[in-house]
């Protein structure tokens, strides 16, 4: 009888802990839902206007101007880390410079509008600013490291491996060009029926591409917030020793990201938990940058470019993230822009009827309209192509663009 009571108490405690973690996850999801919809809608508008076919011709070398263009085009592309990595390989195979392709990849995952919105909502505008300042710094450092350590022979070997066309993840999604095909001014193209269709298709496909990582990130963040005491993180991040914390944060931040398996927008909720736990400002920015180094993506690099280039990318990306983290810590520290309070306080265990609820209702209606357009304009067959071969034809969107263009 006593044993049964103990088991019941343990079961109740475990279920209570799980329930608390799920409650925090649900609360955080509700808090950021409208911002996610807004961010992906704005991203869909940009991707609908930027034609994929024009990108390769602009990325033929690694001059500073080309890297700036590559970064900007990346920011106008998919925020799904897997799709960004696949698209960078596709651009490289079609003749883009390797450094420019990597700059495109970094811009696609770290400088997109939806990431900035979620960072501002969860953590504060300073983190959004740091992300958009630190991203170009990381690309600059990476370009210098490539000049020093990545020779023509290694690039040729990587291109030979890339030409084998081994599949990674989200290949079909990366190969789809869902931009508006008709001619005309920006607003005429955007407000046309094909424009609405393109926006709807990009919006839904982007959501589906990042949904797994977003859910995983929210669940991990909720579990850590519920189960791991802040005292552990404060000790781990040396929070009581500010000078050492500033040194340690950018070093350990990317390592935490690598083993978390969370990428894309999904690592922002976890970043909020780590910030509340005591990681340095530069450390949390380096953590967010490191979604391109999680273990599944490292394995994709090995398939795409070979084991040696994968190790080079691991070393150079990691070094550039650490340096960017240090420079962000120094720059924002000297300008007094680092928040004095660790107030990423979106994780409460209850949902209330407030402005967030109203915004969620409004943007859920917008999302529903885009989903209906996606379904009624022939978008469902595209779902089967998301994980397809990188060399498979993806002309579905072109066909129904013609259908709606009259």
Swiss-Prot record:
The chain crosses the membrane at residues 30-50, 67-87, 111-131, 132-152, 208-228, 246-266, 278-298, 312-332, 361-381. One of its GO terms (cellular component) is plasma membrane. It is found in: Cell membrane. InterPro entries: DUF318, UPF0718_permease. It is a multi-pass membrane protein. Induction: Repressed by RicR. Induced by copper. Disruption phenotype: Mutant is slightly more resistant to copper. Mutation does not attenuate growth in mice. It comes from the Bacteria. Keywords: Cell membrane, Membrane, Transmembrane, Transmembrane helix. Belongs to the UPF0718 family. PANTHER family: PERMEASE RV2963-RELATED (PTHR42775:SF1). This is Putative permease Rv2963. It comes from Mycobacterium tuberculosis (strain ATCC 25618 / H37Rv). The lineage of its organism: Bacteria, Bacillati, Actinomycetota, Actinomycetes, Mycobacteriales.
């Amino acid at each position: 009888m006593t044993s049964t009571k103990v088991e019941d108490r343990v079961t109740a405690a475990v279920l209570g802990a799980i329930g608390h973690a799920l409650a925090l996850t649900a609360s955080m999801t509700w808090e950021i839902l409208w911002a996610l919809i807004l961010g992906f809608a704005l991203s869909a508008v940009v991707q609908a206007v930027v034609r994929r076919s024009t990108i390769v011709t602009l990325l033929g070398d690694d001059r500073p101007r080309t890297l700036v263009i590559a970064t900007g085009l990346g920011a106008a592309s998919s925020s799904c880390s897997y799709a960004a990595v696949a698209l960078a390989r596709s651009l490289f195979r079609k003749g883009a410079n390797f450094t420019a392709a990597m700059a495109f990849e970094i811009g696609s995952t770290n400088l997109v509008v939806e990431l900035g919105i979620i960072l501002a909502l969860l953590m504060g505008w300073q983190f959004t600013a740091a992300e958009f300042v630190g991203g170009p710094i990381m690309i600059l450092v990476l370009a210098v490291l490539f000049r020093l350590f990545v020779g023509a022979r290694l690039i040729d070997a990587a291109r030979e491996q890339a030409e084998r066309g081994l599949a990674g993840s989200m290949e079909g999604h990366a190969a789809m060009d869902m931009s508006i095909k008709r001619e005309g001014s920006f607003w005429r193209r955007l407000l046309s029926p094909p424009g609405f269709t393109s926006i709807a298709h990009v919006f839904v496909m982007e959501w589906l591409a990042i949904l797994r990582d977003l859910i995983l990130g929210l669940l991990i963040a909720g579990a850590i917030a519920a189960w791991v005491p802040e005292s552990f993180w404060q000790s781990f991040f040396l929070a009581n020793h500010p000078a050492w914390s500033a040194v340690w944060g950018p070093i350990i931040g990317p390592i935490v990201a690598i083993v978390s398996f969370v990428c894309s927008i999904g690592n922002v909720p976890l970043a909020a938990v780590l910030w509340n736990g005591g990681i340095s400002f530069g450390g949390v920015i380096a953590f967010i940058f490191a979604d391109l180094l999680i273990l599944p993506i490292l394995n994709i690099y090995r398939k795409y470019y070979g084991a040696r280039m994968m190790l080079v990318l691991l070393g150079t990306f990691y070094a550039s993230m650490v340096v960017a983290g240090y420079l962000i810590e120094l720059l924002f520290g000297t300008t007094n822009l680092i928040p004095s309070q660790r107030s990423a306080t979106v994780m409460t265990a209850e949902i209330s009827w407030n402005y967030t609820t109203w915004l969620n209702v409004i943007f859920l209606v917008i999302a529903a309209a885009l989903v209906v357009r996606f379904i009624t304009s022939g978008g469902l067959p595209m779902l089967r192509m998301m994980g397809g071969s990188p060399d498979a034809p993806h002309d579905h969107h072109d066909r129904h663009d013609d259908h709606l263009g009259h």
